């Protein structure tokens, strides 16, 4: 009598964030099904958990239109090869982790072959290009969503979706230790502290840094003891920021940090930041914030027509109201930014109310996402 085939899960991750999610999912599945087999496109973390890599994740990790066009033939070859090999393997479930442009078509190919498919991490269909939801519905048996309003969106279109909570919410404490973070950064416990996070992309740092620095100068006039911390994502962004600072605010003393954004947020009384994942992380760090964002006029004009949400920052989308101030385009200027930040630095009623709401929202999305994702995979595999 032939031995029963072990549970076989195929996965494709296209970037580092997907590799982290994939590794957490594999770990949770192995705890329940120790002999399960994992194959696909994997990064170093997934491979360390035992995933057999048919292709290295770096093959898919291309950014920007020019880079994608340059690699298009190779990407199409990989997708066709994976379709063929997964069809032959017939895994119990296929999990496409993020990388929607690559994975959703692959999921559709496999679903047609009778393979059960999951898309892990919803694209921002609720915000723009909403018609993508129909392709997602045709291509997948289940979407795993980090945020509750994403599930509500899919429910409207009868696309099966499971809210699993956010892995970042699982990783961060409900009550971070501000003084411990200040000790790490060398910030006095009794000083006022402001974090500036002008973004991770070059264009964001270029557009926002000068106004963020001028805002800090205005706030320093009100709070002479103000410590300013600026975490920068890499050496290139740091060099870019230093050049802008030398022109705009050469005399402003700041703590420039290599990475360490989370520590900076936890240590600070308030943060001024570009939108994006940083706003969610800042909320989970319980740091009151103001979102300031500017883009080229045509890009903003286009975005206003494409984006369907009332707010741009995740804390506001989660709260369903303007919990944090969003100052966009011409509103994103030093005087208005400083006015919005002043009550937060005062550590009074405004910042305490914001902190309490941040904690409530943290609890809402802290659901042990790795375990929830594993539940979804095993239920679909049955």
From Swiss-Prot:
GO biological process, one term: lipid A biosynthetic process
Family matches, as CDD domains: Glycosyltransferase_GTB-type (cd01635)
Glycosyltransferase as UniProt keyword: yes
Any single Gene Ontology cellular-component annotation: membrane
Biochemical pathway: Glycolipid biosynthesis; lipid IV(A) biosynthesis; lipid IV(A) from (3R)-3-hydroxytetradecanoyl-[acyl-carrier-protein] and UDP-N-acetyl-alpha-D-glucosamine: step 5/6
Source taxon at top rank: Bacteria
EC identifiers of the protein: 2.4.1.182
Enzyme class: transferase
A GO MF term: lipid-A-disaccharide synthase activity
Reactions catalysed: 2-N,3-O-bis[(3R)-3-hydroxytetradecanoyl]-alpha-D-glucosaminyl 1-phosphate + UDP-2-N,3-O-bis[(3R)-3-hydroxytetradecanoyl]-alpha-D-glucosamine = lipid A disaccharide (E. coli) + UDP + H(+); a lipid X + a UDP-2-N,3-O-bis[(3R)-3-hydroxyacyl]-alpha-D-glucosamine = a lipid A disaccharide + UDP + H(+)
Keyword Amino-acid biosynthesis found: no
Protein keywords: Glycosyltransferase, Lipid A biosynthesis, Lipid biosynthesis, Lipid metabolism, Transferase
TM helices/strands, residue ranges: none
Disulphide bond pairs: none
Family, per entry: Belongs to the LpxB family.
Function of the molecule: Condensation of UDP-2,3-diacylglucosamine and 2,3-diacylglucosamine-1-phosphate to form lipid A disaccharide, a precursor of lipid A, a phosphorylated glycolipid that anchors the lipopolysaccharide to the outer membrane of the cell.
Record's protein name: Lipid-A-disaccharide synthase
Designated gene of the protein: lpxB
């Amino acid at each position: 009598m032939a031995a029963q085939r072990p549970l076989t899960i195929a996965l494709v991750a296209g970037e580092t964030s997907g590799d982290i999610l994939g590794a957490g999912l594999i770990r949770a599945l192995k705890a329940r099904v120790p002999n399960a087999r994992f194959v696909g496109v994997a990064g170093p973390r997934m491979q360390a958990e035992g995933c057999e890599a048919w292709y290295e994740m770096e093959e898919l990790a291309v950014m920007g239109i020019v880079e994608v066009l340059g690699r298009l033939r190779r990407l199409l070859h990989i997708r066709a090869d994976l379709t063929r090999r997964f069809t032959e393997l017939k895994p119990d479930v296929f999990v496409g982790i993020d990388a929607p442009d690559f994975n959703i078509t692959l999921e559709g190919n496999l679903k047609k072959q009778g393979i059960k498919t999951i898309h892990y991490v919803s694209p921002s269909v609720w915000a723009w290009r909403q018609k993508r939801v129909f392709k997602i519905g045709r291509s997948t048996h289940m979407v795993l969503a980090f945020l509750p309003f994403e599930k509500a969106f899919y429910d409207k279109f009868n696309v099966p979706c499971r809210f699993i909570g956010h892995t970042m919410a699982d990783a961060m404490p409900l009550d971070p230790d501000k003084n411990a973070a200040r000790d790490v950064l060398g910030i006095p416990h009794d000083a006022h502290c402001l974090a500036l996070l002008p973004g991770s992309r070059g264009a964001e740092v270029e557009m926002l840094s000068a106004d963020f620095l001028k805002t800090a100068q205005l706030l320093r006039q009100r709070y002479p003891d103000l410590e300013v911390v600026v975490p920068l994502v890499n050496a290139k962004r740091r060099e870019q920021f230093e050049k802008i600072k030398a022109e705009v605010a050469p005399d402003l003393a700041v703590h420039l940090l290599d990475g360490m954004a989370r520590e900076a947020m936890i240590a600070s009384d308030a943060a001024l930041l570009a939108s994006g994942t940083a706003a969610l992380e800042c909320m989970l760090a319980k740091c009151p914030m103001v979102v300031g964002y500017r883009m080229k006029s045509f890009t903003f004009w286009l975005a206003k027509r494409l984006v369907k949400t009332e707010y741009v920052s995740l804390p506001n989308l989660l709260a369903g109201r303007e919990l944090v101030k969003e100052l966009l385009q011409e509103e994103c200027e030093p005087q208005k930014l400083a006015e919005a930040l002043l009550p937060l630095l005062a550590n009074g009623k405004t910042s305490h109310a914001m902190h309490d709401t941040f904690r409530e929202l943290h609890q809402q999305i802290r659901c042990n996402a790795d375990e929830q994702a594993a539940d979804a995979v095993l239920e679909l595999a049955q």
